[in-house]
Amino acid sequence: MKLHELYPFPEERASRKRVGRGRATGWGCTSGRGNKGQNSRAGAKHRAWFEGGQMPIARRLPKRGFKNYPFKVVFQPINLDRLLASFDGKDAITLDDIYDRGLAPAGALVKILSVGEVAAAVTVEAHKFSAKAAEKITAAGGKVIALGTPEALTETPTE
């Protein structure tokens, strides 16, 4: 196949529609824009949510609820089968090992989930474990080291 054989062929492409070239064309006069108003003018753009200057619906309705975005804690989930496949035969898996293998972005909070089976005893270090994942690892003779979230690590006990 050559460049000139690619579809659509230049002669098959529809030519550009030229508007405003007389009423006989069917696209003369207002050029398909209707009569007057903001949208008939050149450069007439308005945001999809703009309501013509009246108070927008988003501002007319009251706020509701609570937004917890600044304090949201997001974990990077990793399934047991993927974790153990990446560290085949290794008896201890640290958080740095997980980051180095690219299973989670560096610095991400890691949670181990229970999809997959544990054949050999292995020590796994992560921020959080699902109950079933921890159960599977300990049942195979392994050890679970839950680091917790950074906030939990920096908290000082009060008396």
Swiss-Prot record:
Xref: Pfam families: Ribosomal_L27A
A GO CC term assigned to this protein in UniProt: large ribosomal subunit
One Gene Ontology molecular-function label: rRNA binding
Keyword presence, rRNA-binding: yes
Coiled coil: none
A Gene Ontology biological process term: translation
Top-level taxonomic group: Bacteria
Composition bias type Gly residues, residue spans: 23-35
Chain intervals for the UniProt region annotation (Disordered): 14-44
Gene3D superfamilies, per database record: 3.100.10.10
InterPro entries referenced in this protein's UniProt entry, alphabetically: Ribosomal_uL15 (IPR030878), Ribosomal_uL15/eL18 (IPR021131), Ribosomal_uL15/eL18_sf (IPR036227), Ribosomal_uL15_bac-type (IPR005749), Ribosomal_uL15_CS (IPR001196)
Entry keyword Manganese: no
Record keywords, A-Z: Ribonucleoprotein, Ribosomal protein, RNA-binding, rRNA-binding
Subunit structure: Part of the 50S ribosomal subunit.
PANTHER family: 50S RIBOSOMAL PROTEIN L15 (PTHR12934), LARGE RIBOSOMAL SUBUNIT PROTEIN UL15M (PTHR12934:SF11)
NCBIfam families from the UniProt entry: rplO_bact
Record-stated family: Belongs to the universal ribosomal protein uL15 family.
Function as written in the Swiss-Prot or TrEMBL entry: Binds to the 23S rRNA.
HAMAP family from the UniProt entry: Ribosomal_uL15
Name of this protein: Large ribosomal subunit protein uL15
Organism from which the protein derives: Solidesulfovibrio magneticus (strain ATCC 700980 / DSM 13731 / RS-1)
